Regions:
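Acidic, mature catalytic/reactive cores of soluble proteins
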Residues: 1-516
């Protein structure tokens, strides 16, 4: 038997766990252990080439010998009970749709199977992470490592708690993912209309809390700055953490566009949502909540209103803030010359813009969300912009980049961001790849220069690959990005992009093992 000191240590409450399966690893050398939120992104790329394996991977983590009896999905092997963003439902729905498009037949049994287990996971989140029952989610490590002012996996100053913009946004996104799955299942089984209504109401309550907690005087939306922030509560007072980071962009991930011709055939769901909108307008004033028809009569559910969407995008698409030649940075470049400093609990905390490797030892030091470009966040942002565009259509345009005077639709913006991600890997006019930086052997040696490495994350200014470098799983999302660009170029051969690349996508498609 193990020594007594191990009976109550790390992972001690996961005694049910029995893992002896083939699992997609984040990295076969530097991270040869599973991580559940990484896996969800792996499965999107895997679904292009092997949807059956991708589905089995998602199902596996919901089985009784993985999922905790209380509904928590194991986070990663070092600390199974840590908390990562709830993206399993999103991945399941995306894989379901990818396979349906590819094969012409949807695997309803798969979607139904994961949905029932994800109900347990959703309930765990609501019971464990909504500390005060006010639909604001706080506490714990949420996968963005050192992005915040504080180490969010440890005790905060003066025993305070952090009401997290990203934690609450992830739950709003989770609610909409579950709503979308329930509506898909309700097309053939009306029983799912009831649970769809449940997730609609969950979303509305979370969105209301996110935008204005009213009596608690907590607003995660900052009207002056036009951005979302965390709020630190300490001994009767609160401090807004006015740090412009990916934390304030994640609210855009909570979006779903619905076909009205589809939901009008679900009378119970439609009746309940219409009652809610008529009788609780106080909860829906600051969000997009089915009220107005959009392009082709579609309806929008989103955490951000149209006006707030424009304001957040104005910051995100500024090259002096988040927009890099290689994607969206995790932290605004503004802090390069203007470090963010806040005092709390008698201590001074500081965050600098660090586009390369972290100068902090937080989370081992070999990880950095204070400036670099990360594929999972960029991919979710691209997809969210496309969902918004599906509702708003041609008439909704924003400056890209901010201040340029060039107005693009959100679909066009999403494609420009995809091109910038591709620019990490593709050769520039001098035949050099940003991903290899100043490593001359990789840039020029004929035996190495065309062997692309999908690094963990990338330099926020130069695109150089950083962190783990041996085919890190979630950077494989570039394959899905390239597939979409390839399909679009085939249907729009004369389309001109604002970001010029000096080769077609064929090169990287081949490297990713994908044929156009």
């Amino acid at each position: 038997p193990p020594p007594k000191e191990r009976l109550h240590g790390r992972n001690s409450d996961w005694k049910h766990l029995y893992n002896a399966d083939i699992i997609s690893m984040p990295d076969k050398w530097e991270y040869p252990w599973y991580a559940s939120w990484d896996l969800a992104f792996h499965c999107i790329s895997l679904a292009i080439v092997d949807p059956a394996f991708a589905k089995r991977q998602l199902i596996l983590f919901l089985r009784e010998w993985y999922m905790h009896p209380n509904g928590q999905i194991p986070a990663y092997e070092w600390a199974l009970g840590d908390v990562n963003p709830p993206v399993h439902a999103w991945a399941a729905l995306r894989i379901y749709r990818i396979e349906a498009k590819r094969k012409g037949v949807a695997d309803r049994a798969f979607l139904e199977r994961v949905f029932h287990k994800l109900l347990l996971n959703f309930t765990w989140w609501v019971n464990r992470k909504d500390d005060e029952g006010n639909n604001v989610f706080e506490g714990g490590f949420l996968g963005l490592d050192n992005i915040g002012v504080f180490d969010r996996s440890k005790e905060l100053p003066e025993g305070g708690h952090l009401e997290q913009s990203d934690g609450t946004s992830w739950m709003a996104m989770f609610s909409l993912n579950m709503l979308a799955i329930a509506l898909e299942l309700a097309r053939e089984d009306k029983v799912y209309e009831d649970v769809a209504s449940k997730f609609f109401e969950h979303f509305v309550y979370i969105a209301d809390a996110m935008n204005n907690l009213g009596a608690e005087c907590t607003e995660l939306w900052n009207e002056r700055d036009g951005f979302y922030y965390d709020v630190l509560h300490m001994q009767g007072h609160q401090i807004p953490i006015r740090l412009r980071s990916m934390v304030g962009l994640i609210p855009l991930f909570a979006v779903e566009t619905l076909e009205y011709d589809w939901i009008k055939d679900l009378p119970d769901f439609l009746r309940r949502t219409e009652w809610f909108l008529q009788n609780r307008p106080d909860l829906t004033d600051d969000i997009a909540c089915l009220q107005q028809p959009g392009s082709n009569g579609r309806r929008l559910l989103a955490l951000v209103s149209e006006e707030r969407l424009r304001r957040v995008l104005r910051v995100m698409l500024s090259e002096s803030e988040f927009l890099s030649d290689y994607g969206i940075r995790a932290l605004s470049r503004y802090y390069k010359a203007n470090p963010y400093i806040v005092e709390a609990g008698g201590e001074t905390y500081r965050v600098d813009y660090e586009p390369g490797e972290s100068r902090s030892g937080m989370f081992g030091g070999n990880s950095n969300w204070r400036g670099p470009i990360w594929f999972p966040a960029n991919y979710l942002m691209i997809e969210s912009l496309q969902k918004f565009d599906y509702f708003f259509g041609e008439n909704f345009r924003v400056e890209f980049p901010t201040g340029s005077g060039k107005m693009l639709t959100l679909w066009e913006v999403s494609l420009e961001l995809e091109k910038r991600l591709c620019n990490i890997f593709l050769k520039d006019e001098n035949g050099r790849r940003a991903v290899f930086g100043n490593t001359e052997k990789f840039q020029t040696d004929e035996h190495w220069r065309d062997h692309l490495l999908f690094f963990e994350y990338f330099h926020g200014d130069h695109g150089r690959g950083l962190g783990a470098n041996h085919q890190t799983g979630w950077t494989g999302l570039i394959g899905k990005v390239l597939q979409q660009l390839g399909e679009y170029e085939n249907t729009q051969p004369n389309r001109k992009f604002g970001v010029t690349i000096n080769t077609t996508t064929d090169e990287l498609l081949r490297a990713a093992g994908i044929e156009k």
